[in-house]
A protein has these predicted regions:
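Short, glycine/small-hydrophobic-rich surface segments
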Residues: 83-117
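Aliphatic-rich helix starts adjacent to a transmembrane/signal segment
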Residues: 14-78, 82
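Long, hydrophobic/aromatic-enriched structural stretches that serve as scaffold segments
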Residues: 43-48, 112-124
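Charged, solvent-exposed alpha-helical segments that act as regulatory interaction surfaces
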Residues: 10, 55, 86-90
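Residue-level detector of short, conserved catalytic/binding motifs and their immediate flanks
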Residues: 27-30, 113-115, 155-157, 305
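Intrinsically disordered, low-complexity regions enriched in Pro/Ser/Thr/Gly and acidic residues
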Residues: 119-335, 340-346
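Short helix/strand-bridging catalytic loops that position acidic/His residues to coordinate divalent metals
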Residues: 58-65, 95-103, 133-146
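N-terminal secretory signal peptides that target proteins for export/translocation
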Residues: 1-17
């Protein structure tokens, strides 16, 4: 009896141990396939949404950076123009003969002078107060300014729109496609004048008496006269290197608003002179017709200029970044109008 009971219990125990193993089941291939499809349908739109958000955020970031750069650029230009003595209009720049009298564009680039003017440049601690002080020349002026006064010199300033022809340039990134343009500034400055000279043929200190910052530019023409502002503008050689003000200015005129001389006439409130004097509104507009992204309206008689810049924020992240009206927000513009307050003897 005990043996029979032990056998039954043993059999039941083995059956209980093996029972669950026989009833366990995994997922079928169809179930796995359905699950994978559902996961794909759910995850793919989510990933697309995330990628779109990241791209949108990136575009907004470069747009913001471009707007800030443009504003900083026009603020700098406005400060520069505020000391202008004479601003050249289109006819004036043409009469100068830029090919020989203005700086050439850097190697492997094309460049157009857009804004050209004369200004006063402050040189601090540069002229001995009188003949009794120990500092007899500008270069000997002590740093504390106790023996020398500040002075002003003339500077010819030219803003160019420059575009690289080499697609791998550091100014053309991402490389390839149409390179953005940039704005560069040239400055040609006269040496410090000697107020104590007794020789009218030598209005300046000798080069040996001047420090590097007082010496001026080798391209400055000492024969320049404001009575003939388009003659002897520079020496035509030994031009200084340009300083880049801002990059990622738009590069094409396709679909962009095109400025006109008539618009400049309206914006600057220019009244044509009475006959028999002639008037051509196109002389008020200075632009590079290949892009119209950096242009100036100039009224030389009033010493006033209105400058406009158009950036291309999309070119910071892609090579195919042509202007479209639906994407105009990514091509921000900045404008400033300034009347030069500088003057000879002021």
């Amino acid at each position: 009896m005990k043996t029979l009971l032990r056998l039954l219990l043993k059999t039941q125990y083995q059956r209980n141990r093996s029972g669950p193993a026989q009833t366990e089941k995994g997922m079928t291939l169809v179930e796995l396939l359905v699950g994978a499809i559902m996961a794909f349908l759910i995850i793919t739109p989510m990933l697309g949404f995330v990628v779109d958000m990241l791209n949108t955020d990136r575009r907004e970031q470069v747009k913001s950076n471009t707007e800030q750069d443009l504003q900083a650029a026009v603020d700098f230009i406005a400060q520069d123009l505020s000391q202008a003595i004479y601003i050249y209009d289109q006819a004036g720049i043409t009469a100068i003969n830029p090919a020989t009298q203005l700086p050439p564009a850097p190697t492997n680039t094309t460049g157009t002078p857009i804004l050209v003017f004369w200004k006063r440049q402050l040189i601090k601690n540069a002229v001995p107060i009188n003949s009794t002080v120990s500092a007899k020349t500008p270069s000997a002026c002590p740093a504390n300014g106790s023996e020398c006064n500040d002075t002003y010199v003339l500077s010819l300033v030219a803003y160019y729109q420059i575009r690289d022809t080499a697609p791998n340039s550091i100014w053309c990134q991402p490389s390839g496609g149409n390179c953005p343009t940039r704005i560069a500034r040239y400055e040609i400055r006269e040496p410090v004048r000697n107020p104590y000279t007794i020789d009218p043929t030598k209005p300046y200190y000798d080069a040996a008496d001047l420090s590097d910052s007082q010496e001026g530019s080798k391209a400055f023409n000492k024969d320049f006269d404001f009575n003939k502002p388009t003659v002897n503008v520079t020496m035509g050689a030994n031009f200084p290197d340009p300083e880049v003000l801002v990059n990622y200015i738009h590069y094409s005129s396709t679909n962009v608003p095109i400025p006109t001389g008539t618009q400049c006439q309206t914006l600057l409130s220019v009244t044509p002179p009475p006959p028999p004097a002639t008037f051509n509104a196109n002389n008020l507009l200075i632009t590079d017709s290949s892009n119209h992204s950096f242009y100036a309206c100039v009224d030389t008689s009033k010493n006033i200029a209105r400058v406009t810049l158009r950036g291309n924020s999309l070119r910071r992240i892609q090579t195919d970044a042509d202007y479209e009206a639906t994407k105009s927000a990514y091509f921000p513009t900045a404008t400033v109008q300034v009347q030069g307050l500088g003057g000879l003897g002021k």
